[in-house]
Design a protein with these regions (language model features):
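Internal amphipathic alpha-helical repeat/solenoid segments
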Residues: 1-4, 26, 32-59, 96-105
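An alpha-helical repeat/solenoid feature that recognizes helix-turn-helix modules
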Residues: 1-22, 55-81, 103-136, 148-212, ...
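...the same signal can extend to comparable exposed beta-sheet modules
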Residues: 25-38, 60-64, 80-95, 253-263
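Core helices of alpha-solenoid repeat scaffolds
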Residues: 35, 39, 85-94, 98-99, ...
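Buried hydrophobic core positions in alpha-solenoid tandem helical repeats
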Residues: 42, 46, 96-97, 139, ...
Length: 263
């Protein structure tokens, strides 16, 4: 299990298309044996790492658990019971998100820990125990309160950046934050929090924040309908934006913010 191999396995597990006519999802790679082999290898890695590290995957990076969760789920495994440690099932959801084993919690890694912690929780809409250290609402608020003050089109707030603090939104992190918040886009809950950039007390719905972020992303698109992250034009940033848009039901081919002047 590694950053490169897990993402590749995730992509293979999700590679397919949805047929709106018959309502079925067709997998273009349906290698059950390959999935099982990878899950078994990954389980061995998790058990070995837990044993060597005293019950953790990493001392700082909660995303080590989160990446595992989404990969295991994509391949048909159960991240809430994946291998054993000291005779007990390993719950990657609990250990990486709501009872995060990283000292300092998911936020030890910055906004990435909160973003992927929420994505991991919602991979299977896992229930968070009432006595858990980190409730679902906290993940949402921690993301919202780091929204940057670089809004466009009359908005004060824009997107997000990897370090959590800065003056200019990053395409990839903004898109990933939107993906994490997507399940709450149509929820009317108003969240009140202190924005860590402006210092202002803010009361907004997730939808309001996400719409501001989409406006900011649209302003970052270049004349070739591409995006730049870390000073580099790349297809990954385009893919992140497409996933963000579709995660809330927006068609990238019809939203004027993401269509160039020449179409």
């Amino acid at each position: 299990s590694s950053t490169a191999t897990d993402w590749m396995a995730l992509a293979m597990g999700r590679y397919g298309y949805f047929d709106s006519v018959d309502g079925k999802y067709t997998y273009l790679i349906d290698d059950g044996t390959g999935y099982t082999d990878y899950l078994n290898a990954m389980k061995s890695y998790v058990e070995k790492t837990y044993t060597e590290n005293g019950g953790t995957l990493h001392s700082v990076k909660a995303t080590e658990w989160h990446r595992g969760v989404v990969t295991i789920a994509a391949l048909g495994g159960d991240p809430a019971s994946f291998g054993t440690y000291n005779g007990q099932p390993i719950n990657l959801i609990a250990d990486g998100s709501y009872n995060c084993k990283v000292k300092g919690g998911p936020g030890k890694q910055g906004i990435n820990g909160w973003i992927w912690g929420l994505i991991a929780l919602d991979t299977g809409m896992y229930e968070v125990p009432s006595d858990a250290a980190y409730q679902r609402e906290l993940f949402i608020k921690e993301i919202l309160k780091m929204q940057l003050t670089d809004g466009v089109d009359g908005n004060k707030y824009g997107g997000w950046v990897l370090g959590g603090y800065g003056s200019s939104s990053d395409v990839d992190i903004t898109a990933m934050a939107i993906q994490a918040l997507a399940p709450y886009y149509n929820d009317d809950t108003v969240y009140t929090y202190k924005n860590e950039i402006s210092g202002d007390e803010v009361s907004k719905t997730v939808r309001q924040c996400v719409d501001e972020a989409f406006d900011r992303l649209g302003s970052m698109m270049n004349d070739k309908a591409g995006f730049t992250s870390w000073n580099t034009d790349n297809s990954e940033s385009i893919a992140q934006v497409i996933v963000a848009l579709t995660s809330v039901g927006i068609d990238p081919q019809k939203d004027s913010r993401f269509i160039t002047s020449d179409g």
